[in-house]
Amino acid sequence: EAMPVTTGLVLREPDGAVVADAANGYITYVDPTTDRSGANGKIFVGAAFPAQVKEAKVVLLSEKEKKDRGGADGHVLAISEYEPGSEYTYYWGSAWDKAAIKTQDAWNKYMAEYAQKLRTPLAVAY
């Protein structure tokens, strides 16, 4: 019997920098790093799923939970159906805004395209 399985990313100071897109099969988050001045840049993180994601959402922690978890504010989650005995696959990745991917929009576009490629792989016929 199928059961839910969850993949998630820890959020610190999410402030709108989170995408939970079940329909397109990816979740993303922009982490501000530890330097509040921005000198260290931002880290983009995400997960893409080749199979259908049933639900994707942000879950924020209560103030007490935040203290107990050392600064985490919550999670962005992708919930899928898992059939025991089968494989569960997802792809996790990251980028840095001081390298090739400079903006949150560029990161989200990259992840959306990557998830689309996972879901519709190249088919070669001869």
Regions found by a protein language model. Name each.
Residues 16-33, 57-65:
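Solvent-exposed beta-strand/loop surfaces of large extracellular or lumenal domains
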Residues 2-23:
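Acidic (Asp/Glu-rich), glycine- and aromatic
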Residues 2-3, 37-38, 51-54, 81-87:
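A short, structured loop/turn motif at beta-sheet edges
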Residues 25-56:
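A recognition module on extended beta-rich or small alphabeta surfaces enriched in W/G with H and D/E
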Residues 9-13, 33, 94-96:
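Short, flexible loop/turn elements at secondary-structure junctions
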Residues 7-9, 29, 45, 90-92:
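Generic structural hydrophobic/aromatic packing signal, biased to beta-strands
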